[in-house]
């Protein structure tokens, strides 16, 4: 009926808020406080070099006061209070949403998890996974707190590390768990969620140990019991969430500092609870949990053996004790001189520990202008074949061309509705694995640090898996989106 014939006019219809909007409104002050905590830990970590310079190997409180405070907050308030422990199930859901259908209301339904993931994504690409895993993960903080308390109670003599050779093997287990869950999720998300009980987070924080059957409680108790004697065992060897964050950590913009002498000095490696420093003094940022102990030693004139040696020499000769420069060495007494004379002969001949692997620069990237650099960069991402690869592994390269053609045909079949989404994902996954092999035989390099710089280094297997996996995930998501925009039902 027209408005003029209705007594009192047409009634105003008030549309109710969406469920996620009501959640955000009802918890607004807690959300604001949670966001403030995330900003605070990021700012504190951004000033890590100032804090580590204020610390020594005997007094780490300028760093630990903040770190322990955030552990307490993450355990007591974020974990047990807000029940906002991030989980691998959210990573799997994100993969599915990216490939099939992105629904904002799904991710906005839990504001704390939503904000936590914004924090995680930003900081992983800035610093690596260590800020979340080492400072803000509720379960990780719980493990480390138990380890520290046990140490303070006199159990230090029983605490140990897994022998390095076994650690270097066992650390791959968490990646296997992650890839297994990811593969299962592509065929059955329900089954993947059940298998994700390999995470003790739900039992610990969401449901409670006393509210679940005994196998779940026993699993949590076993992990926390082992944590008394081994630092963060779950984080280092089992956690699929940590593995999923470790892979993009390969491309973090800012890493922890190393100096040339680190390749022959083992002081930092001995004290590294994450066992993330190798025999050459290089830090594996996929494994590093950012305790910052090595950064404290980096400028500690009494704790760092190379600095202590130089300090004693200067004191004996009555020379000035200058401050420590950004390169980790004493600033030269005479400005015109170099710090190179402070580097031991053994260290000078060894590998450069400032990068995770040996630096390199592809020949075709040398001395080119911006336009040429841009097209070469694009070609590097899309075209994995190389002259070096053809020379060393011609059969592998030819087979790769055949598989690439097959993958292209598979996408074409998907475009006309002749191939299911599961089949195209299987094809794309197979091609991605083969692309790793092709690149390792020729274009064996990845970037270290910001993507717009030409800081290349030799790629290890996990470096290449991380690079190809992340790149092809984005390409696959873009192709799925294009097919959907064309009206193709997948």
Q: What is the role of each PLM region?
A:
Residues 2-279, 286-287, 293-350, 479-480, ...:
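Non-ligating segments of multi-cofactor redox enzymes
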Residues 37-40, 75-76, 183, 395-415, ...:
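Canonical alpha-helical transmembrane segments of integral membrane proteins
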Residues 154-155, 242, 248, 356, ...:
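Cytosolic, membrane-interface loops and tails of multi-pass inner-membrane proteins
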